[in-house]
Amino acid sequence: MTQHTLTRRGLLIGSAALLAGLPQLSLAQSGGPSIHVLKDPNCGCCSAWIEILEGDGFTVTTEASMGTMLMRYKSDNGIPQEMVSCHTGQVEGYMIEGHVPAADIRRLLAERPNAVGLAVPGMPYGSPGMGPESEREAYDVFLILHDGSTEVYTNYEAA
């Protein structure tokens, strides 16, 4: 019968292997970036946008909010009035206002600019959750800077 003893070296190698695998385990369990969304509970387009994000691997939690409470949340978190849309999300310290495509959110998280976040003001037809992309009208995704100014982050031409 063979007797196995645990050496310090074996313990260190095993521990290192376990720790190396933890980030992958964590990502597999979470399903991707987590975004918390404040929205009017009666808004169908907000729900459609959330379904698109979930289909793209985001983990989404929601909170019902409307009227002055929602507008105050937007303002308190650096969303300029001219950038406002129907729902507001927060992901990894960034604000996401309106029907921002998942690809732009992923790009934001990869690039990590010094900014408040992204916005698609209004509700442009054909943006995620707002009708078929094949019929979309032209719209811009804006990067909101900390001084309240904005710059075009991505331009989507009409289909």
Protein language model annotation of sequence segments:
Residues S75-A159:
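Thiol/selenol-based redox catalytic cores and closely related redox-interacting motifs
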Residues W49, M66-M69, P101, I105:
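Stable alpha-helical elements in mature extracytoplasmic
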Residues I52-T61:
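Conserved helix-turn-beta segment immediately C-terminal to the redox Cys motif
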Residues V60-M71, V91:
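Thiol-based oxidoreductase modules, predominantly thioredoxin-like and allied folds used
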Residues S26-A28:
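Boundary at the C-terminal end of the N-terminal hydrophobic targeting segment
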